[in-house]
Regions:
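Extreme N-terminal leader/targeting segments of oxidoreductases
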Residues: 4-86, 104-110, 611-655
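Glycine-rich Rossmann-fold phosphate-binding loop(s) that bind the pyrophosphate
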Residues: 90-93
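A short, Lys/Arg-enriched amphipathic alpha-helix followed by its capping loop at the start of a domain
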Residues: 98-111, 297, 301-303
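Glycine-rich FAD pyrophosphate-binding loop
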Residues: 103-130
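Conserved FAD-binding subdomain of flavin-dependent enzymes
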Residues: 134-174
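Rossmann-like flavin
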Residues: 161-268, 280-281
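Helical element adjacent to the flavin cofactor pocket in flavoenzyme catalytic cores
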Residues: 264-346, 351-352, 364-365, 370-379
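C-terminal segments that line or cap access tunnels to active or ligand-binding sites in enzymes
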Residues: 267-282, 344-346, 351-576, 582-596
């Protein structure tokens, strides 16, 4: 056979073989499709519309709900609760909330609840004290809003310690009705001049598109990514970013995932971002307004507070797929002690801390010192627990780079009337009326420290002299020289921080040093881990509130993981507490879901227009969009869709 004939024969044979394979493949595909069709038909025939099982508990022993039916219901007493004890590590907001839920909804005897606190005072990060050697100290403040569902569920039941017969929520509600919060000057430039941000975000079309893209990105696509990975200068140079990073303390290197969650969580408040009209504040500092009423409620219930008790580890037994907390290791007044546990002993631990390692300065001393992770404390405790099982999280993701997690705040207290006029010129209100003053932070837009300051209702402390004003100041950039004080904020005394603040208030330079020395006292606080929870993360870095397999142990607070909610809020602390108690104790009541504005078409339409400073999304210049826009608008004409688009200013006159 010739070579040509041989090649032809081979080709024919190959073709026949390929045809046979294709025929076989085609037949197999038909069979697969037929099988799928049969399964789909079987599924349809088995389908039944019902709401039975709609609120079945998940693997954590909880379910989420919304609406008044569940919100107003009182759960039955869980079975066997009288035979159980609870050990709560820490006495911050999350821990106290857990104890309150154990008392109110779990109906556990107060004497069975033991709060183990390393310090000699409750409150954790929710502080507010007068230090005779330094002055008034507030490391931070608490911005709240009407859709903190778990927080308000709790505080409706906590009696006021000022007004007999009403709750903390009642007081708070009335206060913010009578004295609503809003700012009259959001930012300044050129030493005290109004920056005239004028309620605008000043985002370009590209910047808006970057935000919208982030908004729609899946969580898993944002694991370990930074904000710099998803935004560029189109966002970073906008007024939106000035508002955002100063209000929430986000830095460019922080988590893109948390940024997205924040945007989704508070989408209903986009319009209130420029003037803080979305926010509500307590009457006093958070210690007096939130912590003390909770502590009294618990003490009245017989809860056992054990101060000067530092928990260093929780030991686990692992058997038959169960993770059982079997012992607590602690130091009581420096003496080592152990607490043996059974499955009937519930343990709740606040893992990590944003205020651990705080270094305090004073009027004449900078807050210098060792800001590294210590051999004790919340971070060490979490590391000891995490070493026992991967499901207990990865603390090192959050506490290993203090250059990226620190900032510094300071409490400035005026001593006379000399600084007051400069404050009044900016915020347009007298700070001594007892009403809203700045209405949120005033950001010094051109400050090298990116300094912001706020004055809440005075007095912030119950025993505060009515002629004194407490100002909270913070700087995002602590390692660069200032504009008046030519050294980094972290190296500055209280007096020097006051001087830098006065410079940005517009005080004449020849008066600054005198006023900083004699007309105010300042207490600076450096917090190495204050934004640790904003560090980029992936799934599993934060442990679940109740890790899989745990039968008597749960995590609380800002470093425990719960779906959809956002850290650095009072709501997050209370939500994790509610979930942990309900899940471990078997409380048969729904946990209020995170407010669902992200799924509300009205909020989405409204926020889109607000973000674009009144421009409609339909005005965005997208190649090819005009071809389909006209037919679509014609299709919806006269329908409820057209009405809602017009109601929320997406469809404007002439469109």
């Amino acid at each position: 056979m010739s070579k040509k004939g041989l090649k032809l024969g081979v080709a024919l044979a190959a073709g026949a073989g390929a045809a046979a394979i294709l025929t076989k493949t085609s037949q197999e595909n038909k069979e697969i499709k037929a099988t799928k069709a049969k399964k789909a038909e079987a599924a349809r025939s088995d389908y039944r519309n019902t709401e039975r099982g709609k609120y079945e508990k998940n693997s954590k022993g909880i379910y989420y709900t919304n609406g008044n039916y569940e919100a107003f219901a009182r759960p039955e007493k869980p079975e066997g609760v009288d035979d159980k004890n609870a050990y709560i590590v820490g006495s911050g907001l999350a821990s106290l909330a857990a104890a309150c839920f154990l008392v109110r909804d779990g109906q556990m005897p107060g004497s069975h609840i033991h709060i183990l606190e390393a310090m000699d005072i409750a409150g954790g990060a929710c502080d507010g004290i007068f230090d005779p050697t330094r002055g008034y100290v507030m490391r931070g403040g608490r911005e709240m809003e009407n859709h903190f569902e778990c927080l308000w569920d709790l505080f409706r039941s906590i009696p006021s310690i000022e007004t007999p017969g009403v709750s903390v929520l009642d007081e708070y509600y009335w206060l913010n009705k009578h004295d609503p919060n809003y700012s009259l000057c959001r930012a300044t430039v050129n030493r005290g001049e109004d920056a005239h941000t004028d309620g605008k975000f000043n985002l370009s079309q590209k910047g808006c598109m970057e935000i919208m893209k982030l908004f729609m990105t899946k969580d898993e696509d944002l694991y370990d990514k930074t904000i710099e990975d998803v935004f560029d200068d189109e966002v970073f140079n906008s007024t939106f970013w000035l508002y955002w990073r100063t209000m929430f303390a986000f830095e460019n290197w922080h988590s893109a995932l948390e940024m997205k969650l924040y945007f989704q969580r508070f989408i209903h408040h986009i319009a209130g971002l420029p003037d803080f009209s979305a926010l509500k504040f307590t009457k006093y500092n958070q210690y007096d307004s939130l912590i003390l009423p909770m502590q009294k409620y618990l003490e009245d219930a017989g809860v056992d507070f054990q101060f000067n008790t530092e928990v260093t580890n929780v030991i686990f037994d692992f058997k038959d797929g169960k993770k059982i907390a079997s012992a607590i290791e602690c130091k009581v007044n420096g003496v080592e002690k152990g607490i043996v546990l059974t499955e009937n002993d519930l343990v709740f631990v606040t893992n990590g801390s944003c205020t651990e390692g705080t270094i305090y300065g004073d009027q004449n001393h900078a807050p210098n010192g060792d800001a590294e992770v210590r051999t004790s404390g919340c971070w060490s405790l979490w590391k000891n627990i995490a070493a026992q099982d991967p499901s207990f999280g990865h603390p090192e993701k959050f506490c290993s780079d203090i250059n990226k997690t620190n900032w510094e705040s300071a409490t400035v207290t005026t001593l006379d009337d000399k600084i007051i006029p400069y404050i009044t010129d900016i915020c347009k209100r007298d700070p001594r009326t007892g009403k809203v003053v700045t209405g949120g932070i005033v950001s010094c837009q051109d400050s090298k420290w990116l300094l912001s300051w706020t004055i809440n209702r005075q007095g912030q402390f119950k025993d505060q002299d009515k002629d004194k004003v407490c100002v909270w100041v913070y700087g995002l950039f602590t390692d660069v020289p200032g504009d008046y004080i030519k050294k980094p904020m972290k190296d500055c005394t209280g007096k020097e921080i006051t001087a830098e603040w006065l410079y940005h208030l517009g005080v004449p330079e020849d008066q600054i040093d005198e006023l900083a020395e004699h007309s105010a006292v300042c207490v600076p606080t450096m917090m190495p881990y204050i934004t640790a929870f904003f560090m980029p993360r992936t799934k599993g870095d934060r442990p679940d509130v109740i890790p899989d397999g745990c039968v008597n142990f749960g995590f609380l607070g800002q470093f425990a993981d719960t779906p959809r909610d956002t850290v650095f809020t009072t709501e997050y602390s209370v939500r994790t507490a509610m979930e942990a108690v309900y899940g471990l104790l078997g409380v048969d009541r729904g946990v209020p879901e995170v407010w669902g504005s992200v799924y509300d078409i009205r909020e989405l339409l409204s926020s889109s227009v607000k973000l674009m400073d009144g421009k409609s999304p339909l005005e965005i210049d997208i190649p090819g969009a005009g071809i389909i826009k006209k037919p679509l608008l014609h299709f919806i004409k006269g329908t409820v869709i057209e009405k809602i688009l017009r109601d929320y200013d997406v469809l404007k006159d002439g469109m």
